[in-house]
């Protein structure tokens, strides 16, 4: 009898342990349309003109990838973990007048490029877990990339050509972005009763001194068998900051639809 009770206890604890282990992995593609302004002023100077991302830089709709992985840990008081990666790429051409960006100053044609990667590590707690699910926590986001401006043939420089700091036609001039940003994290999901459909809002946000940064995803999901599902929704990113790089000021938005393949295990 004792052996049977012990075996039953082990099996019960094993089921309980297995029940508490879970997670989710998703891979998606999101479409983003830019809007807003940016400027880059060399340190200790007053130069630097504000440019419009669409009209001056020629940025338009583009597509990029996004990855997310959630791990629900079975340890008491230990937070769950979410890892995420997304990239944000834009490129375009524009014709500018009285343009000033770092050491580039003048009028004419330019090529521009944004290459930005975001890496998230999120620790969160599950506050509700039934028809309504609610998570809250803290995200540490690492931004790495650059904004590059290249003056092309025909650009009329107003800075003296030939000086040590003078720009050159056809040479790209990147402005590097490299920083960590702490953000508050939250997720709310409504599981429609008796259906394999759920509605979800997930967001990160922070506002301090010269920076306001937030992103959110509003989505609907249909789950098939074995935890596999499809998710579609709307993703928006807003960044208003003077802290990305010394002299770089941005007030930009990227938003558009996205779709993901999801595995809930």
Outline where the language-model segments fall.
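Transmembrane beta-barrel architecture of outer membranes
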Residues: 179-185, 211-219, 229, 252-258
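Residues on the lipid-exposed face of transmembrane beta-strands in outer-membrane beta-barrel proteins
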Residues: 27, 67-73, 121-125, 138-140, ...
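Repeated loop/turn-to-beta-strand initiation elements of outer-membrane beta-barrel proteins
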Residues: 77-81, 131-134, 194-199, 227-230
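Outer-membrane beta-barrel "beta-signal"
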Residues: 22, 253-265
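Cleavable N-terminal export/targeting peptides
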Residues: 1-22
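Extracellular/periplasm-exposed beta-strand and loop segments of Gram-negative cell-envelope proteins
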Residues: 33-64, 85-117, 144-179, 206-208, ...
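Transmembrane beta-strand segments that form the barrel wall of outer-membrane beta-barrel proteins
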Residues: 196-211
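Transmembrane beta-barrel strands of outer-membrane/channel proteins
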Residues: 25-31, 81-87, 136-142, 188, ...
